[in-house]
Amino acid sequence: MMPKNSRENRAEQLAYLSKVRHQLISSNKVGELILKAKDESLDDKNKANLREMEREYIMSSSLPSDLVEKISSASAKCEGIWEEARKKSDFKTVLPFLEELVILTKQESLILSEKLKCSSYEALINKFEPQANERKIKTIFENLETFLSPLIDQIIDKQKNEEIISISNLMTQEQQKEVGLFLMQKIGFDFNRGRLDTSQHPFCGGAYQDIRITTRYNEIDPFSSLEGIMHETGHAMYELNLPSEWKYQPAGQSRGMAMHESQSLLIEMQITRSKAFKKFLSGILKNNFKFTENCWDTENIYKLEQE
């Protein structure tokens, strides 16, 4: 949605701001203040704030400012090129920019792993999920593999004989947006504090009390668009419902990607893929949006989602 010919300048601006922010957070003065604060008598709320401040300080002070600046610039450039390449499924165009970003990220991971005394992979995980480790993740996936592997075969076998009516090219992009906005409102999204726009991929971002959701529309598979909207609505509602009394404080920010994704997947997977929701959706499509064909019946759209 931003002008593409200004991309290079925006990348430079973001890189500079990232460098300034990094220098402020990683300064010796901040480290001294954190040490002094540890001697204070703090309530639980401010103990949590101090914990998060120290974590951010350790991560930031471990990295040189020029590397932080380079990563920010490379990330902004790569995202801009990817947005154009995504329209044409042109991976070759984005590849060199992605390679540069990967090289810089590996440098970051090596520095952080040495500081945190863990593997490079675990160091990067901790940027997005505090206190996560490879052992914990490995255990979770091993348990999932034991449960899911035989179940997937059973599901595929069951679906072989099911008759499903296609809905391809039966819902325009504008209709998808109208349905998506309607569902967002029903789920409880506050349009006085956020909005929905179009992009090359579903995203959720913004600032306190100002959340922006984007999605892309697919006339071949309209439910992929609707699920994308519902997924990002989950992210948005989590952000909009963080405790207002802790706004702008470290402990009042989202905890990590595991919690964030749990909220988006709760909406997308547990709610919108359930048969109860499909019954609700079928009624909405037929009564409110006049989609009267049999393909919009509850059983058919439920089966479509299970494929």
Where are these regions (language model features)?
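Contiguous, non-catalytic segments that form substrate-binding/exosite surfaces or channel walls
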Residues: 71-223
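Short acidic (Asp/Glu) and glycine-rich catalytic loops that position anionic groups and cofactors
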Residues: 1, 54, 158-160, 209, ...
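Long, amphipathic alpha-helical stalk/connector segments used for oligomerization, subunit docking
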Residues: 271-307
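A glycine-rich phosphate-binding loop feature that marks nucleotide/adenosyl-phosphate handling sites
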Residues: 5, 199-202, 254, 281-291
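Active-site metal-coordination segments of metallo-dependent hydrolases
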Residues: 250-261
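Secondary-structure transition/capping motifs at alpha-helix termini
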Residues: 186-192, 222, 236-247, 271-278
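A well-structured
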Residues: 1-130
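Active-site recognition of the HExxH zinc-binding catalytic motif
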Residues: 113, 224-244, 261-268
